[in-house]
Amino acid sequence: MTFSRWLSDLVRSSLGVGVRRLRSVSATIGVIGADSRLAQSFGSFGRGSALLFPQGVIYNEKYIRIGSGTLVGPDVCLTVGMGPSQEMLTNPVVSIGDRCVIGRGSHVIGHWSILIGDDIQTGPYVYITDQNHGYEDLDVPVGLQPTKEASVRIGSGSWLGANCVILPGTDLGRCCVVAAGAVVRGSFPDHTVVAGVPARAIREFKDGEWRRPKG
């Protein structure tokens, strides 16, 4: 190995170590915890909760409540309304309970009411919203049509798999499981496993045993 090659490899290795250390330090000091100034801008922010670094887009956080012991992963977006400083008709708009884990890159987009219970875990890149565009006028681009809101509730103890989508009007009972990639709308009782596009119940716990739903 020539001296120039050795020096180039040494510099590259040293830079790599420096970048990794900087990333580690940034991840540590960039956390938003209950005692941080930014946490005070939320409607409430429970003890032991944290928003990991780097955070995604966050605005109108005064309408967002986060319980205790909840971990929000990196790049998670938490937004209320169409833009910062919009005054909302309901408060809170987004409520995340105690001891939840929101996976990396997930989006919680609230306009009316999103209630996420306690002890809920999501995989990465889950999308939860209570608003969608209408499609009544075929001559108007869908993105320009009036929006419609419908409350979302996710029952305590539920698990949402990676890349699933929770649409307006969804009402999940306690301890439900949503399969990865499912697109969910509608009501599902406690202890139901839902999967598919559109999602449907594939297992439910009734009379002391797991059953495949009829129909």
Question: Would you name each region that the model predicts?
Answer:
Residues 1-129, 155-157, 164, 174, ...:
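Domain-scale signature associated with acetyltransferase and cell-envelope carbohydrate enzymes
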